[in-house]
C-alpha cells in the first residue's frame, strides 16, 4: 500500500492500493472509530457498481451504512441537490459524530464535501475516488463547492477530508472518455512540476503505470497544499488550464466535461505563452502533442467574445484581475495577474477567433 500524508488544517493520509474498497470500513474505523452512521454519497452509475460493496465493508466494520444517490452529473452539482442531501442526512438523524463517505468522481466529492463542511457546522468525511480525475486531483486538498447559474464552484469552502481511500481497481469500469478526462489533470501536473514525469507520460500510457501516476500527482498536490492550503499563493498553480477551461465548460452548458475543458484551457494558454515569448514554440508544441497523444481536445469552436464573457465570472478574478497560470517550460509555470480587460487579447494569442 502507498501512503501519502497530507499536512493541512486537518492532517490525513491518502492510501492507494488495489482492492482497498473492500477494506474501506476497517480503514475508516482505524481513523475515526466505529459505531457511527456512515452516509455514502454516490451518483447513480457509481452506486450501482460500488455502493453495495462499500456498504458491506462499512457494516462489517461496525458502521450503520445509508446511501444517498443522485444523477451524478455536473448539472446536478447545485444548491438544490445540496439541499436534498442535507435533508437526507437529517432524515437519517446523522449527528456530528457520524460521517459522510464520498464515493465517485469530482462532482460527488465537491457536493459531499460541502455538505459535510456545513451540516451541523461540520461532520467528518472520507473521499473514495472512483475516477482518475478525482484520484489524482480533486479528492485531495479540501476544496468543496456547488455551482450557480453564473459559473462553476461559486459557493463552497475549504474542508479537508479525514481520509482518502483510492482503489485503482475501480478505474477499470471508467468509460474511455472519462479516463481521458483524468489524463488531462495528470498532464497538468507534469507541465507544472516535472519534466521527467512528462517524459514518462510520453513513453508509457497512464493506464500502464496508474498507481505510480496517482502517487506522483497526489505527492505534488500535497506539497502545494502544505505550502498554501487556502489558495492565496503557490497553490494557484494548480489552476493551470482552468480559467479558460471553466469558460469552455460554461459555454457548452457543461456538455464539455472538466478534463476536456482543462485540456483546451492548457492548449490556449500554451499557444498564448509561446506567442508572447514566455515559453518557446517547442514547449508549446510538446504540450499540444501530449494532449493529442491522449486523445484530448486542443481546440474549441466557442468565440473569443463568448469565452471572455464566461471567464469574467471566474471565481479566480480578484480586484479586477484574473490569475492565469502560464508555462515557462515543461515542469515550470508562473502566475500572471492580468486585468480582466486583457482577457480577449490572451484568448486571441491562444488561437481563439
Map each language-model feature to its residues.
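ATP/NTP phosphate-donor binding region
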Residues: 1-99
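Short glycine/serine/threonine-rich phosphate/pyrophosphate-binding segments
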Residues: 107-114, 135-136, 247
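A glycine/threonine-rich phosphate-anchoring loop and its flanking beta-alpha core
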Residues: 15, 114-204
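Generic secondary-structure signature for well-ordered alpha-helical cores
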Residues: 151, 160-164, 169-176, 184-196, ...
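C-terminal charged capping/lid subdomain of soluble metabolic enzymes
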Residues: 184-187, 279-353
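Active-site segments that bind and position negatively charged phosphate/pyrophosphate groups
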Residues: 199-306
Amino acid at each position: 500500500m502507498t501512503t501519502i500524508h497530507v499536512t493541512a488544517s486537518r492532517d490525513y493520509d491518502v492510501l492507494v492500493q488495489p482492492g482497498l474498497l473492500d477494506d474501506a470500513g476497517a480503514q475508516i474505523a482505524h481513523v475515526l472509530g466505529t459505531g457511527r452512521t456512515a452516509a455514502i454519497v454516490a451518483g447513480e452509475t457509481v452506486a450501482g457498481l460500488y455502493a453495495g460493496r462499500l456498504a458491506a465493508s462499512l457494516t462489517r466494520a461496525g458502521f450503520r451504512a445509508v446511501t444517498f444517490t443522485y444523477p451524478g452529473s455536473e448539472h446536478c452539482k447545485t444548491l438544490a441537490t445540496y439541499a436534498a442531501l442535507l435533508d437526507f442526512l437529517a432524515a437519517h438523524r446523522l449527528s456530528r459524530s457520524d460521517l459522510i463517505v464520498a464515493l465517485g468522481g469530482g462532482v460527488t466529492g465537491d457536493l459531499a464535501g460541502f455538505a459535510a463542511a456545513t451540516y451541523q457546522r461540520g461532520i467528518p468525511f472520507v473521499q473514495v475516488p472512483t475516477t482518475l480525475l478525482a484520484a489524482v486531483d480533486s479528492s485531495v486538498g479540501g476544496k468543496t463547492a456547488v455551482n450557480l447559474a453564473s459559473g462553476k464552484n461559486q459557493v463552497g469552502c475549504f474542508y479537508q477530508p479525514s481520509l482518502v481511500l483510492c482503489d485503482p481497481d475501480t478505474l477499470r469500469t471508467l468509460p474511455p472518455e472519462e479516463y481521458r478526462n483524468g489524463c488531462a489533470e495528470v498532464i497538468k501536473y507534469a507541465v507544472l512540476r516535472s519534466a521527467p514525469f512528462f517524459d514518462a507520460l510520453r513513453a508509457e500510457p497512464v493506464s500502464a503505470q496508474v498507481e505510480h501516476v496517482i502517487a506522483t500527482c497526489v505527492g505534488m498536490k500535497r506539497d502545494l497544499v502544505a505550502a498554501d492550503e487556502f489558495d492565496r499563493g503557490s497553490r494557484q498553480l494548480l489552476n493551470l488550464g482552468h480559467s479558460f477551461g471553466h469558460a469552455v465548460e460554461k459555454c457548452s452548458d457543461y456538455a464539455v466535461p472538466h478534463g476536456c475543458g482543462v485540456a483546451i484551457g492548457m492548449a490556449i494558454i500554451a499557444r498564448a505563452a509561446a506567442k508572447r515569448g514566455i515559453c518557446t514554440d517547442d514547449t508549446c508544441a510538446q504540450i499540444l502533442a501530449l494532449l493529442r497523444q491522449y486523445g484530448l481536445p486542443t481546440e474549441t469552436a466557442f468565440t473569443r467574445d463568448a469565452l471572455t464573457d464566461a471567464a469574467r465570472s471566474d471565481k479566480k478574478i480578484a480586484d479586477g484581475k484574473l490569475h492565469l497560470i502560464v508555462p515557462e517550460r515543461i515542469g515550470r509555470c508562473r502566475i500572471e495577474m492580468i486585468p480582466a480587460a486583457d482577457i480577449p487579447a490572451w484568448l486571441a494569442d491562444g488561437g481563439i477567433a
